[in-house]
Amino acid sequence: MPRSKRSKLVTLAQTEKKGRENKERIFDEVRQALDTYRYVWVLRLEDVRTPVLQEIRSAWAGSKLIMGRRKVLEKALGGTRETEYKENVSGLVKQCEGMCGLLFTDETPETVTAYFREYRKADYSRAKSRAPLRVEIPAGVVYSRGGQVPAEDDVPMVHSLEPTLRNKFKMPTRIQNGKITLEQPYLVCEAGETLDVRQALILKQFGVAAAEFRVKLAAYYDGEAAAVEEVRINME
């Protein structure tokens, strides 16, 4: 039985209420943190994966990391001199782009910059990013790492994945003697090539984590000095 228009409106209202409550929660948390910690750092965390975010939160357990979109963070910080919650904190707003994190801490700027200069995580390349290296799957039996390691250190890819390789990833594979095989080498991507969704999925399937995730530091606010300092860490 089709849903009535009324039920759809109720569902939409519930969704809007939840979104509004989340924005209000972030607003309150930001202002409370501004009253608690001396420094506020703008971390650019576009496309950050959940395990990475959890690791950063764990490493900075004595501090507070709040994630949010620019509009929400701008409202909490105050985007102008007239609306800013703390003197000159509105200067941070222009540094917030896309999905950002605000790290509230009492650790010194030297400690923060040293940590994030060194922090990096191997990551899978995403669609629309550039391929970090040339990847070609050798002809013959298809191994789980796709030729990245010697065959004696690898295992053949399980035969149940053959339909996925052939139908979803469009690789010309077939089953021969119970193993997935390629008659010819299969080029996945050239180094520097812009990846599409299919190529990114193939790289992930074969465990090619050659990309690198780094946190970009844009600026920080010092509550005692009431000043914003631009730092530009990992912005290259």
From Swiss-Prot:
It comes from the Eukaryota. This is Ribosome assembly factor mrt4. Belongs to the universal ribosomal protein uL10 family. Associates with the pre-60S ribosomal particle. SUPFAM superfamilies: Ribosomal protein L10-like. Keywords: Cytoplasm, Nucleus, Ribosome biogenesis. It is found in: Nucleus, Nucleolus; Cytoplasm. GO terms for cellular component: cytoplasm; nucleolus; nucleoplasm; preribosome, large subunit precursor; small-subunit processome. Gene3D superfamilies: 3.30.70.1730, 3.90.105.20. CDD domains: Ribosomal_P0_like. It comes from Eremothecium gossypii (strain ATCC 10895 / CBS 109.51 / FGSC 9923 / NRRL Y-1056). InterPro entries: Mrt4, Ribosomal_uL10, Ribosomal_uL10-like_insert, Ribosomal_uL10-like_insert_sf, Ribosomal_uL10-like_sf, Ribosome_Assembly_uL10. Component of the ribosome assembly machinery. Nuclear paralog of the ribosomal protein P0, it binds pre-60S subunits at an early stage of assembly in the nucleolus, and is replaced by P0 in cytoplasmic pre-60S subunits and mature 80S ribosomes. GO terms for biological process: nuclear-transcribed mRNA catabolic process; ribosomal large subunit assembly; ribosomal large subunit biogenesis; ribosomal large subunit export from nucleus; rRNA processing.
